[in-house]
A protein has these predicted regions:
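Self-processing/autoproteolytic domain segments and adjacent N-terminal interaction modules in large
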Residues: 1-151, 165, 171-180
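Ser/Thr- and Asn-enriched, surface-exposed coil loops between beta-strands
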Residues: 155-163, 194-198
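A short local loop/turn or secondary-structure capping micro-motif enriched for an aromatic residue
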Residues: 10-11, 73-75, 156-161, 210-213
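Solvent-exposed serine/threonine-rich low-complexity stretches and specific carbohydrate-binding patches
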Residues: 149-157, 225
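Short, compositionally biased serine/threonine- and acidic-rich segments at solvent-exposed termini, linkers
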Residues: 173-225
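Short, charged low-complexity linear motifs
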Residues: 123-131, 162, 185-193
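Generic detector of ordered, mature protein regions
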Residues: 78-80, 130-132, 160, 204-206, ...
Length: 225
């Protein structure tokens, strides 16, 4: 695409099939000189499921962006070029294995760009262990020798299509979606404690709760421990 405008690609039906592992640039979308605004990359899989990637630059306008999205088998193969294994014990997520990853890879290349990116996947690609399938997911990136910690958030789905969004991405490469075991079962928006005479009033607000049964509030006796 020679236009980097946010309306360079629009969709009413259909989409771009990126599930091509033949190499030589096959199945990739190249956008020249990306500009501001949310950019839709309307990928579909070989079954016609709509799995868009939405990329919204926050800085670095004018960068060239190359992006692809590929379905895999449950063992996460075929791997993208440059990735030879998933189970790396020296990575930042100790013990990451094929059981922890959604069955899809994404590859993005861009230089000097910072953006918010949303990745979509089909529920059929969610082959995580049953107890993790509806948990929070995070975006992981291959560094060349290991994986970054999960970042961003989105809930796992077992029907339809799921989406996970990562903010302020400035380093690109090979991305996957992992069960985010580091995430709390709640997304906390606010927490306040106010003195009222001899008591303390505590209020909090959550944006989302997953498998959360109750809250436990603890008070320090000495203000330190």
């Amino acid at each position: 695409l020679m236009s980097g405008d946010s309306q360079a690609i629009t969709r009413t039906a259909g989409g771009i099939i990126s599930d091509d592992h033949s190499g030589s640039g096959s199945g990739r979308v190249v956008m020249k000189g990306i500009q501001s605004g949310p950019h839709l990359f309307p990928f579909i899989d070989e079954n016609g499921s709509y799995l868009p990637v939405i990329l919204q630059p926050t800085s670095g306008f004018g960068a060239d962006v190359t992006i692809s999205s590929n379905h895999t088998a449950q063992d996460n193969r075929p791997f993208p070029s440059g990735l030879s294994t998933v189970a790396v014990t020296t990575d930042l997520i100790a013990g990451l294995s094929t059981d922890n990853l959604i069955d899809r890879w994404w590859e993005i290349t861009a230089s000097g760009l910072t953006a918010n990116v949303s990745f979509s996947y089909s529920a059929l690609e969610n082959t995580l262990p049953i107890d993790l399938r509806l948990s929070y997911l995070g975006v992981v990136r291959w560094t060349g020798s290991g994986w970054t910690q999960p970042a961003g958030s989105g809930l796992g789905v077992t029907l339809g299509t799921g989406m996970v969004t990562m903010s302020n991405v400035s380093t690109f490469g090979i991305f996957g979606l992992s069960a985010n075991n580091l995430a709390l079962p709640i997304e906390l928006v606010s927490f306040e404690a106010k003195a009222k005479a001899t008591e303390v009033e505590i209020t909090w607000t959550t944006a989302a709760e997953v498998n959360n049964d109750y809250f436990v509030i603890e008070r320090s006796a000495d203000g330190r421990n």
